[in-house]
Design a protein with these regions (language model features):
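Caspase-like cysteine protease fold
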Residues: 271-305
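Active-site histidine-anchored catalytic micro-motif
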Residues: 4-256, 260-270, 279-282, 286, ...
């Protein structure tokens, strides 16, 4: 593991390109998106699913997830996929500090040490960490969402590789106790369908309407499989449709953690529910030569802590 003689800082490599690098302008953008998203709909989140594209494409969608975060949590786990490096497991950062234009975030290395002790986690290089965008794109939103908290908080970022369902279940079991802790919450970084020739994916069911309508229905079938909170359901969906959900492995690990917690709670009803609060596409595909990326925002809640009342779930629309 990395040297502990002095803090290793992960630089904000995408600031100024994927999102605004000027702190005051970035803060204004985040404020506007969060205000447009409105007040929390479903109580304090135990986990959210949030996109990780450039903010001009997905910032307004991501705000629907981040508005659900309560500043009472003291530790935020961030699970992002690996786009550039092939991993056969889950990797942790060598850094102690993550830089953002809005202020630095501190990694909870005590939790890292607990995870390393399971022999299931490896350490990535700083270059691998800085080259990956899926975690970094969540950081400014985290700083903004936690700005009302007066006490310190820490993050636990991890990069989830292309792992099989058995490993997803194993990592879910390890992380379940952290998800159950009321001091913690999880951010799951994922875009949804990447459609088009450049993504080598052009599933189109003509009976569902135009191409963009087919994509939306495809994505919403995926959302419904996630709402089951059963790993087998999500895995079966992916096998049937092959949807290019880049964060499918982080999502699956979260589902596995919830499924484990629910299985341990044998005398009660299911503990957790997930709602999808927003859905968007980067463009509306009309022709087979078009392309688009889909984004969604979701919030996982402990049922006993959830607000009572009707929730508009875009997965059901």
């Amino acid at each position: 593991m990395g040297s502990r003689n002095k803090p290793i800082i992960r630089c904000a490599r995408k600031a100024g390109s994927w999102y605004e690098g000027q702190p005051d302008i970035l803060d204004q953008q985040l404020t506007q998106w969060l205000e447009q998203a409105g007040p929390p709909e479903f109580g304090p989140a135990k986990a959210i699913i949030s996109p990780h594209a450039g903010y001009e494409h997905c910032g307004s969608c991501a705000a629907y997830a981040y508005k659900e975060i309560g500043p009472e949590v003291s530790r935020i786990f961030i699970l992002g996929p690996s786009h550039r490096v092939r991993l056969n497991g889950v990797a942790l950062s060598p850094a102690s500090i993550y830089e953002t234009p809005l202020g630095n975030l501190t990694i909870d290395r005590d939790v890292y040490n607990e995870l390393y002790a399971t022999d299931m986690f490896e350490e990535m290089s700083l270059q691998t960490d800085e080259n990956e965008h899926s975690i970094e794109l969540q950081l400014p939103f985290i700083v903004k969402a936690m700005s009302k908290r007066t006490e310190p908080y820490k993050i636990v970022p991890m990069m989830v590789g292309s792992i099989r369902p058995e490993k997803e279940a194993a990592y879910g079991k390890i992380l379940a106790k952290y998800l159950a802790d009321p001091e913690n919450m999880f951010v799951i970084s994922s875009d949804f369908c990447h459609w088009g020739h450049r993504f080598d994916y052009q599933f189109y069911e003509k009976s569902w309407g135009k191409i963009y309508q087919s994509i939306e229905r495809l994505d919403k079938l995926g959302m419904k499989s996630i709402k089951d909170l059963k790993l087998d359901s999500f895995v079966s969906y992916l096998k049937e449709y092959g949807n290019t959900i880049c964060g499918r492995h982080p999502i699956a690990v979260m589902i596995a953690a919830v499924e484990y917690l629910n299985s341990e709670n044998k005398t009660q009803n299911q503990n957790y529910q997930i709602k999808f609060l927003n859905y968007a596409q980067s463009s509306r595909c009309q022709h087979m030569y078009d392309s688009s990326v889909s984004y969604t925002a979701a919030s996982l809640k402990d049922v006993k802590d959830a607000h009572v009342g009707p929730i508009n779930d875009v997965a059901d629309c």
